[in-house]
């Protein structure tokens, strides 16, 4: 049990003491997935049968309790105020923005990492977006299975492929449309933050889709998607997999018109990620009216003084932030005045008075 009723929480301790587990638990209650693994079985202690997370929070001056449990039999129970609920409703209660050392590799990571970042941010603003992603994946898997059977020579009605492609077009076009729209909105905020940190550099975000050439309207995207599926139909049948769609797209970052992934220094890339994370915090607050909890997982030690100072000064009194660090040396005394500090050692956590 841990009381996080202060606006600013600092958890200090050596590595492998459990600091990250606390942030992961908070994040889990907002995303229903771990930031480090896609297999929820891995969050269960080796000697336990279930994983349970309970939290009480105040939202709009009203107390709300969240209860999550997951068993090794893959049984999941979600409750809000003691009443069972759906994943969609559960995830609407708590919003978080996680900034960890892994995020610093966002620009040079896999396209799937950048898609996950974008999708996670969008889903906190538009709860139905998660359902579209799930629906798209189900249709895509069904199509891939159909193509695998087809390549084996199993006699199948190929009109089913046309039906699946049309379903992919409708659902996938909606996903792409929302991604492009959100990216344009967050770019406006991120450009300004990036300009302040870097002083002179201009940031640009580009949604990279193989079959689009600047189209942004839903009908245009759907038409292009439909055409791309038809154009690559033979290739997909030969490879037995879906070759085009939002599951193959990427997000490109440019600094002064140069692609950051290829040409930016480590410091420049970290400036981009810092601007993105703080912009994510702002846009979620602006769109939903809910201030997300900012989770900073050992990330300050990886930033230079300029970026550290900008990050800490960006944390307003309205923002609840939970920070993990090996010690308090990175923080100015003025910042620490309003911070509740906990120390964790050997799995035990105590408040520093």
Label every model-predicted segment.
Residues 97, 322, 340-342:
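Hydrophobic/aromatic beta-strand patches that form the interior of the parallel beta-sheet core
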Residues 1-14, 155-293, 302, 306, ...:
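Conserved NTPase motor "head" modules and their coupling/switch loops across ABC/AAA+ ATPases, GTPases
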Residues 20:
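Walker A/P-loop
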Residues 55, 320-327:
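Structural recognition of the conserved hydrophobic beta-strand(s) that form the central parallel beta-sheet
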Residues 297-299:
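Walker B catalytic acidic pair
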Residues 30-107, 111-113, 117, 122-125, ...:
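Nucleotide-state sensing region of NTPase/ATPase domains
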Residues 1-6, 26, 39-40, 118, ...:
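Long, non-coiled-coil amphipathic alpha-helical linker/lever segments
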């Amino acid at each position: 049990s841990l009381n996080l009723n202060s606006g600013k929480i600092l958890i200090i301790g050596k590595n492998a003491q459990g600091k990250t587990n606390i942030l992961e638990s908070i994040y889990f209650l907002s995303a229903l997935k771990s930031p480090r693994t896609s297999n929820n079985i891995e969050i269960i202690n080796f000697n336990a049968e279930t994983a349970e997370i309970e939290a009480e929070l105040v939202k709009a001056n009203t107390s709300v309790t969240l209860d999550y449990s997951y068993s090794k039999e893959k049984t999941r129970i979600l409750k809000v105020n003691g009443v069972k609920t759906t994943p969609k409703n559960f995830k609407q209660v708590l919003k978080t923005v996680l900034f960890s050392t892994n995020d610093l590799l966002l620009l040079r990571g896999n396209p799937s990492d950048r898609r996950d970042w974008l999708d996670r941010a969008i889903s906190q603003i538009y709860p139905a977006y998660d359902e579209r992603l799930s629906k798209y994946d189900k249709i895509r898997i069904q199509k891939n299975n159909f193509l695998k059977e087809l390549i084996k020579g199993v006699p199948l009605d190929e009109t089913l492929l046309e039906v699946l492609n049309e379903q992919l077009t409708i659902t996938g076009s909606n996903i792409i449309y929302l991604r492009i729209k959100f990216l344009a909105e967050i770019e406006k905020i991120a450009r300004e933050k990036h300009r302040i940190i870097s002083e002179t550099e201009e940031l640009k975000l580009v949604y990279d889709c193989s079959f689009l050439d600047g189209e942004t309207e839903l009908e245009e995207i759907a038409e292009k998607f439909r055409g791309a599926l038809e154009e690559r139909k033979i290739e997909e049948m030969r490879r037995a997999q879906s070759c085009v769609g939002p599951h193959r797209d990427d997000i490109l970052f440019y600094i002064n018109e140069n692609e950051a992934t290829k040409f930016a220094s480590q410091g420049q890339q970290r400036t981009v990620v810092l601007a993105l994370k703080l912009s994510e915090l702002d846009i979620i607050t602006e769109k939903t009216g809910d201030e997300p909890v900012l989770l900073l997982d050992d990330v300050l030690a990886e930033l230079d003084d300029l970026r550290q100072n900008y990050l800490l000064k960006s944390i307003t009194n309205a923002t609840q932030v939970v920070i993990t660090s090996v010690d308090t040396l990175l923080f100015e005394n003025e910042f620490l005045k309003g911070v509740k500090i906990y120390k964790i050692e050997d799995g035990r956590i105590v408040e520093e008075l």
